[in-house]
């Protein structure tokens, strides 16, 4: 949505005493300055892979658009939540240091998720869940309560979805991966 619509939605939520909102900051929206006047407590950087090149034309332009949130929009002492195992982590670390942002790494929470072992979970789902948990904690939710509620979470259809399991333990999964990186992550999860 355009900037005016975003602010109308946020104002409506505020009037209805909704104090924490999660917004997907698309590279298009960042590039078009649609999110510049929003006060974010934190931002999550999940990954970076070949996508949206019809708009951005090249990977450098695409990455620069995604980094606008971290380089220009987040205010001092805001948080960046990410995975130290992604290629862009050193860039995020440098931005955090230069801008006085706090970088939250997800290794410990990933271990806790794996111990709780939720159904068939791919590595990318575990990482995304870990980042969401860290964001929820920043909104004041207690970790213990978050982990209790995980049993109620329904998977997104078509994302490493177990479609069928045969008696000989062969499993069929559906995933709508549409980028080379997403397909690779699905295949790596199946390998495990």
Task: Please state what every model-predicted region is.
Residues 1:
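Walker A (P-loop) phosphate-binding motif
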Residues 178-192:
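AMP-binding/adenylate-forming catalytic core of the ANL superfamily
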Residues 29-35, 187-189:
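Short amphipathic alpha-helices and their capping/turn segments at secondary-structure boundaries
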Residues 175:
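Conserved phosphate/oxyanion-binding catalytic-loop motifs
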